[in-house]
UniProtKB/Swiss-Prot annotation:
Coiled coil: none annotated. Residues 984-1198 are annotated as: Autoinhibitory domain (AID). Residues 539-844 are annotated as: Interaction with SKI and SMAD1. This is Homeodomain-interacting protein kinase 2. Residues 820-829, 990-1045 have a biased composition (Low complexity). Residues 600-800 are annotated as: Interaction with DAZAP2. The lineage of its organism: Eukaryota, Metazoa, Chordata, Craniata, Vertebrata.
Length: 1198
């Protein structure tokens, strides 16, 4: 029988594994620490570190550990089997390794070869850190016993058990009694029984605040699980109940999707609550320790960040706070087979945001948010602070703020990031512990106490534990710079570091209200890697994309149709069935068919080869977890007779266009009925006044993807008899609401109302709403949706690569053409399938701005916006017909000046506020500013090699306040036979979340470079243009009958691409827009004659209105309205067949200037006089979509 040592209040029973041949004496070091309820014992791998804080004497025993490889798991519900370490907190070490107390244990020694001896020791680096890593702040101090292994002693062969001698300590602490009480006394090979399973204890893994964790074998299977045995002490009962309830809530979600540990079951064992978890391999701290605390390259930090941010996104959507995020609680699932695949563990400190108590001690100190230190109200943002500290620690190899006390913690933060704002300090309940008011000043301000002052008041001596002391976070980019990179790889590393620091500063924003959210984090350029697309041939970039492969969704049998998970759409294959059938990528989550009847949507899971990103399937694909943080609350939205009750996927933008009439063609140019919904976290709905039939769509239709590069749309036009496909994109944008009945009646309280011509644009109304649940189709309402081919744009930087990889561009459109509410193009192949049902009604026109710069008008405060919804409106100012387009973005002057810090040095990309700068809209699909193959010489933005200059501090705030307006100003052309049309409605896009139009230098696609600083919201509307070449990219259109809309997408650090949408045509005479401005009062001079004489009856009627006097000489822009006629369309170059041309080439004219105040000579390189569309005599190409289903005509414009 193993000896029993009696402590002051409880017994410690020590067992030694019979497989060991020797015992060990141990000595106890007494260290002054701050006792707390949050000590962690993470013993794992070949080394274990044991912290004991109790009045009982820990006995040194070689702790057992598992073999690196785990047993195979035949259970299909487990995709992989790992071992887990659950960091714990306080409590004394009762047993480090236990064996049977009788000879029976010796007989069972054979199978115990799974257990190997490991060292129980204290890591030297922890001593350097002051041994305060996981301790909490308490006024009194106590002893901590640190176990050290000593040379082995003689084994007692008679008993078969090694007897260890332990020294005793008289040190006690005031709180050690409660911490030590309630722990379950473990015995190795003990059996824990639940209602359905039995588990045999294999070894002790760790101890936490609320219990201990053991490794167990699930009898009857070869599954290894981790069981957390909670204390039964009353002081922990309530928190244990909260943890169980949170785990129960999380168990309804896909743990693999959202990257948190999977809990299998909960049961009672001898009055102790036992939680059964999947086994994971190693925590991040042990991983760092194993690698000698060497800094982790950014290419490895990125997948860890993405996965943890995905978990935080889900927790935020559930209103949960983890409250103890740190490297010890981020587990590597299987480092050997799935490098950098991580999951979040330990929800023992978690709580619901509504139950967050101010002044509560939460989080480990190194990762404690300022609001916790200062005693401010807090929310889920504290987890984002912790994550920022974690990734900084991975980057540095050392904690960023390793405070030995809370005073040191806030001192470190203040020295690097500045003092917290005055209003935060004044509101904090614990501010006076660390700050004093300067009473001598007439305006008393807070100042940080000096270390001597704090020591005099508290007796706690301040220590310096930092390895790096930064004056600002930007200085972090200079440390640990690798020296083995050369050429473009070094540029990639520098660009990556800039984006990393930019994201880190947003995560470590002291004001929690301004701190970046998980969804915004997932859309930051550092995570989406848009800044790396400037270096397509860099092996370093390829490695970065390959490392992100681990974030892909993995489908396993755990996700069956019986699981209540939200399905996610990828590229949808065409279907000819009569009901709404959709095909999902099998790397997305499970299909959950909630259709109440056969007439509802049915969803099939298929097509596993479809890529869900803008990269080839061999490259990075997103985690479906990031694709769908699904809000749990349901909010049906009523609009007339239409009801939309969809489940929001906040990390994806879904566009749903559902006109009311499904029996026939009922839409008209003057009254377009339908719904246009852009879905996101706060999901506003785009409604249009006419009543519609109730529409319900499966949650899967509201799809979502993690790596934003466009928008995802589901287009359901009326009177379509079959669903042929749905184009999906990845983006995060807020939806906007545009009721047509309000046009001309309501006006936005923004800058446009100060202009004579601006107050009469179609008003825009936002109705933020949370779409939850699902939407089903009414009975007997089959739909037909054309497939929009999602182009894949491959970034290239050399002429040769552009020519050699043109064919790859069709599947690598980094920008993923956005197919939005009323934009569609029917391919020749697809039009035959849909022409009998509903003709195509709009064209998708793209161009490629080689230098989309952020330009702000010098209109002063006039350009500032007061709308909190952060809307962006696109203003189209046509003057006379022209095939060319230039873009002027009018940003609000609320943008902070510091955003100009990294402004590009290009002469084209002027980043100063209150100035007007030009944007070159580049026609060539071979748009690469580094070569001269294009007819227009385009200046390359300096930000291409500088992380796109998006790492300024004000970008987030700018997103919240800036309201840029985009004006499309084509050059002046005086062709009387051409008439233009202005869009019917303008759709603002909320930019609180970053859109993700990827920038690319592609061989056959647009180069959407954006020169705005820090995502200053220059919504540059560009038109994709296709240059004649051997490889043409086809865009397969989506047909719909919606009003023409402009959607300006934007996001911090990304590049925007906006589409021009062609409205359904009007058969009646041209009309003018009701602007009060004198220049807007009449129809364009060219309109009346040209509409009647110059156009065939089947050609589009084009409408226009005169530009304002200030921009009257700058040109016009065309938006085409199709008239009655063909169901198919092509814009053809003479030498190419109709099947390959689906884009409108637009040439750049010489007289395009964004403002009369800028001389043409300032932009000689942007507006070249030549045009390469020689096939078009008028240098313009128009595309129209007639409405008549009876006629099928094509008009190759030559």
């Amino acid at each position: 029988m193993a000896p029993v040592y009696e402590g002051m209040a409880s017994h410690v029973q020590v067992f030694s594994p019979h497989t060991l041949q020797s015992s060990a004496f141990c000595s106890v070091k007494k260290l002054k620490i701050e006792p707390s309820s949050n000590w962690d014992m993470t013993g794992y791998g070949s080394h274990s570190k044991v912290y004991s804080q109790s009045k009982n004497i820990p006995l040194s025993q070689p702790a057992t550990t598992t073999v690196s490889t785990s047993l195979p798991v035949p259970n299909p519900s487990l995709p992989y089997e790992q071992t887990i370490v659950f960091p714990g907190s306080t409590g004394h070490i009762v047993v480090t390794s236990a064996s049977s107390t009788s000879v029976t244990g010796q007989v069972l020694g054979g199978p115990h070869n799974l257990m190997r001896r490991s060292t129980v020791s204290l890591l030297d680096t922890y001593q350097k850190c002051g041994l305060k890593r996981k301790s909490e702040e308490i006024e009194n101090t106590s002893s901590v016993q640190i176990i050290e292994e000593h040379p082995p002693m003689i084994q007692n062969n008679a008993s078969g058990a090694t007897v260890a001698t332990a020294t005793t300590s008289t040190a006690t602490s005031k709180n050690s009694g409660s911490n030590s009480e309630g722990d379950y006394q473990l015995v190795q090979h003990e059996v824990l029984c639940s209602m359905t399973n039995t588990y045999e204890v294999l070894e002790f893994l760790g101890r936490g605040t609320f219990g201990q964790v053991v490794k167990c074998w699930k009898r009857g299977t070869n599954e290894i699980v981790a069981i957390k045995i909670l204390k039964n002490h009353p002081s922990y009962a309530r928190q244990g109940q909260i943890e169980v309830s949170i785990l129960a809530r999380l168990s309804t979600e896909s743990a693999d999707d959202y990257n948190f540990v999977r809990a299998y079951e909960c049961f009672q064992h001898k009055n102790h609550t036992c939680l059964v978890f999947e086994m994971l391999e190693q925590n991040l701290y042990d991983f760092l320790k194993q690698n000698k605390f060497s800094p982790l390259p950014l290419k490895y930090i990125r997948p860890v960040l993405q996965q943890v941010a995905t978990a935080l996104m889900k927790l935020k959507s559930l209103g949960l706070i983890h409250a103890d995020l740190k490297p010890e609680n981020i587990m590597l699932v299987d480092p050997s087979r799935q490098p950098y695949r991580v999951k979040v563990i330990d929800f023992g400190s978690a709580s619901h945001v509504s139950k967050a108590v101010c002044s509560t001690y939460l989080q480990s100190r190194y990762y404690r948010a300022p609001e916790i230190i200062l005693g401010l109200p807090f929310c889920e943002a504290i987890d984002m602070w912790s994550l920022g500290c974690v990734i900084a620690e991975l980057f540095l190899g050392w904690p960023l703020y390793p405070g030995a006390s809370e005073y040191d913690q806030i001192r470190y933060i203040s020295q690097t990031q500045g003092l917290p704002a005055e209003y935060l300090l004044s509101a904090g309940t614990k501010t006076t512990r660390f700050f004093n008011r300067d009473t001598d000043s007439p305006y008393p301000l807070w100042r940080l106490k000096t270390p001597d002052d704090h020591e005099a008041e508290t007796g706690i001596k301040s220590k310096e534990a930092r390895k790096y002391i930064f004056n600002c976070l930007d200085d972090m980019a200079q440390v640990n710079m690798t020296t083995d990179l050369e050429g473009s790889d070094m540029l990639v590393e520098k660009a990556d570091r800039r984006e990393f620091i930019d994201l880190l500063k947003k995560m470590l924003t002291i004001d929690a209200d301004k701190r970046i959210t998980p969804i915004e984090t997932l859309n930051h350029p550092f995570v989406t890697m848009t800044h790396l697309l400037d270096f397509p041939h860099s092996t370093h970039v390829k490695s970065c994309f390959q490392n992100m492969e681990i974030c892909k969704r993995r489908v396993n049998m755990y996700d069956t149709v019986n699981q209540s998970k939200t399905p996610f759409i990828t590229h949808v294959a065409p279907s000819t069935s009569t009901n709404l059938t959709m095909t999902f990528n099998n790397q997305l989550t499970t299909v959950h068919n909630q259709a109440p009847s056969s007439t509802s949507a049915t969803i099939s899971l298929a097509n596993p080869e479809v890529s869900i990103l803008n990269y080839p399937s061999t490259l990075y694909q997103p985690s479906a977890a990031s694709m769908a943080a699904v809000a749990q609350r349901s909010m049906p939205l009523q609009t007339g007779t239409a009801q939309i009750c969809a489940r929001p996927d906040p990390f994806q933008q879904a566009l749903i266009v559902c006109p009311p009439g499904f029996q026939g063609l009922q839409a008209s140019p003057s009254k377009h009925a339908g719904y246009s919904v852009r879905m996101e976290n706060a999901v506003p709905i785009v409604t249009q006044a006419p009543g519609a039939q109730p529409l319900q769509i499966q949650p899967g239709l509201l799809a979502q993807q993690a790596w934003p590069s466009g928008t995802q749309q589901i287009l359901l036009p009326p009177a379509w008899q079959q669903l042929t496909g749905v184009a999906t994109h990845t983006s995060v944008q807020h939806a906007t609401v545009i009721p047509e009945t309000m046009a001309g009646t309501q006006q936005l309280a923004d800058w446009r109302n100060t202009h004579a011509h601006g107050s009469h644009y179609n008003p825009i109304m936002q109705q933020p709403a949370l779409l939850t649940g699902h939407v089903t189709l009414p009975a007997a309402q089959p739909l037909n949706v054309g497939v929009a081919h999602v182009m894949r744009q491959q970034p290239t930087s050399t002429t040769s690569s552009r020519k050699s990889k043109q064919h790859q561009s069709s599947v690598r459109n980094v920008s993923t053409c956005e197919v939005s509410s009323s934009q569609a193009i029917s391919s020749p192949q697809r039009s035959k399938r849909v022409k009998e049902n509903t003709p195509p009604r709009c064209a998708m026109v793209h161009s490629s701005p080689a230098c989309s710069t952020s330009v702000t008008c010098g209109w002063g405060d006039v350009a500032s916006s007061t709308t909190r919804e952060r809307q962006r409106q696109t203003i189209v100012i046509p003057d006379t017909p022209s095939p060319t387009v230039s873009v002027i973005t009018i940003s609000s002057d609320t943008d902070e000046e510091e955003e100009q810090k990294h402004a590009p040095t290009s002469t084209v990309s002027k980043q100063r506020k209150n100035v007007i700068s030009c944007v070159t809209v580049h026609d060539s699909p071979y748009s690469d500013s580094s070569s001269n193959t294009s007819p227009y010489s385009v200046q390359q933005r300096a930000g291409h090699n500088n992380a796109n200059a998006f790492d300024t501090k004000g970008s987030l705030e700018n997103h919240c306040t800036g309201n840029p307006r985009t004006i499309i100003v084509p050059p002046l052309k005086t062709q009387a036979s051409e008439v233009l049309v202005e869009c019917d409605s303008l759709v603002p896009v909320n930019t609180s979340h970053h859109s993700s139009s990827y920038k690319s230098k592609s061989s056959s696609n647009v180069t959407s470079t954006s020169g705005h600083s820090s995502g200053s919201s220059s919504g540059a509307i560009t038109y994709r243009q296709q240059r004649p070449g051997p490889h043409f990219q086809q865009q397969q259109p989506l047909n719909l009958s919606q009003a023409q809309q402009h959607i300006t997408t934007d996001r911090t650090g990304s590049h925007r691409r906006q589409q021009a949408y062609i409205t359904p045509t009007m058969a009646q005479a041209p009309y003018s827009f009701p602007h009060n401005s004198p220049s807007h009062g009449t129809v364009h001079p060219h309109l009346a004659a040209a509409a009647a004489a110059a156009h065939l009856p089947t050609q589009p009627h084009l409408y226009t209105y005169t530009a304002p006097a200030a921009l009257g000489s700058t040109g016009t822009v065309a938006h085409l309205v199709a008239s009655q006629g063909s169901a198919r369309h092509t814009v053809q170059h003479t030498a190419y067949p109709a099947s390959i041309v689906h884009q409108v080439p637009v040439s750049m004219g010489p007289r395009v200037l964004p403002s009369p105040t800028i001389h043409p000579s300032q932009y000689p390189a942007q507006f070249a006089h030549q045009t390469y569309i020689s096939a078009s005599p008028a240098s313009t190409v128009y595309t129209g979509y007639p409405l008549s289903p009876a006629k099928v005509n094509q008009y190759p414009y030559i």
